[in-house]
Structures are given as C-alpha cells and as structure tokens.
Amino acid sequence: MYYILFLAIIGYLIYLVRKPKRKPLRVFDKQWKKLLDENVYYYRRLSDIEKQRFGVRVMQFLSEVKVTGVNLELKPLDEALVAASATIPVFGFDEWEYAYLDEVLVYPSTFNKGFEYGDGAKDRNVMGMVGDGYMNGKMILSRNALRNGFKNTTDKHNTAIHEFVHLLDKEDGSIDGLPEVLMSHQYTIPWLKMIHDKMEEINSDKSDIRNYGGTSETEFFAVASEYFFERPDQFKRNHPELYTMMVQCFKQEPKYVAVSR
C-alpha cells in the first residue's frame, strides 16, 4: 500500500517538473489587434466586445502553449495566426485549454510523415499534423500553409484550424470524427449517419465539401469544420442540417459570430 502511494507521489512530482511552465500573460495591445484585424477575417467580423474577449483568449493560449519556429525566424504574425486558429473553434466556450498540446512547431515548408522537410526529404506533402507517439503533445504546421489559410478566405481550406479541430476530437482520447466532449450523447447516432451520408455525396462528386473529407470520418469532421468557419453563409445554404449540427457542436454560429447560448 505504502509502496503504491510512494510511486504515485513520485509520479506526480515528475509530472510537475516536466509540465511546461505557463508564461506570463502578454497584454493584448495595439500590435496584436492590428495583426488580427489585418489577417483574420473571423476576428474582423466580431463586435468590439467580442474582439477584446478573442484577444484575451489568444494571449492566454500563447501563455499556455509554446510556439517554436524550426529553422526559421518566428514572426509575431505566425504566433498570432497559430493562436487565432486555436481560439476560433473553441470561441463558443467560456474557457478552454487544450489537454493534448504543449507546443506548436512551425516548419518553413511542407514535410513528410517522418517530420522531415527540405530538399532532401521525400514525400513532403504534409501541411499540418497532430503528433503522436514520441511527438505526443506537439502540433506541426507548415508556415506557408498557416499563412495561406488566412490569406484565402474563400477556398474553405485552413490547415491550422483543421489540425486544432483534430485536437478537439482527441479530447475524448481518440481522433475518430466523433467529438464526444463537444456533442451530447443523443446526437451521436444522427451525427454518424450524417457523416456517412455526406461522405457518400463527396465520393460521388455530389458535394462542394473538399474531397479529402470523404477519406474517413476523422477527416470529414476536420474538413467540414474548415468550411463551417471560413464560409458559414455558403455552408448553411448548401448543408443546412449539417450546419445546425455544427452550431450545436461548437456552441457558436460564425455567420453571426456571437456565442450561441
């Protein structure tokens, strides 16, 4: 009994030592406001009160999660876009801390599944990834993909938001397209049926949802979420039932932006 208690105490102390230290909360000043206003369309549509709340959430994220440039000089814009990508999917919740994330690595370009990049690396076609195994707790993003996701607001494609939605999906322990922490149990079966119906439409070329969403339930949820946050009006018009389900899931309606209570 005492031996087990001793091991538990040692384990907890190791956790405290290894747990990333929270950085001091930075002030949401004019520089950050300007970066978000010029580069994040979602932010521009917010009311003044919501913009301030969004900014505070961005600063909180940057105090909790380390953003590291890998062989590149990380710019404030990169930090702002990473933090905005993290904040957008959970802005409908009063508070949210990503349980499975301690660092975001920003690569200069696309990479492969072995996290290799540069001219000598083969199969460099990955733009973003949630790490697992020895990379658990990490997210990897290509800087080009990160920035392009916010430059083009009409293509229904945002790599960073896509990866943060995967993290939300992982909150229940697995990335499977069924975000149980966001969804009441009663909606599970209707959600799965809707996913399969929509995937069938994608794979039959009868949908404007990106083809990658038809590859698995996991990717469908992330791809549909990109569309939901980038083009909410079009998403609601073309996929009204799915739109309603996503509003319930994310507790917000991007068309109107204000938190849906």
Q: Could you describe each region identified by the protein language model?
A:
Residues 81-97, 109-151, 174-261:
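Metalloprotease/metallohydrolase-associated module, dominated by Zn2+-dependent proteases
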Residues 50, 54, 153-157, 218:
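Hydrophobic (often cysteine-bearing) scaffold residues that line and stabilize catalytic clefts
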Residues 17-128, 242-245, 249-252, 259:
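A metal-dependent hydrolase signature that marks the N-terminal structural subdomain at the beginning
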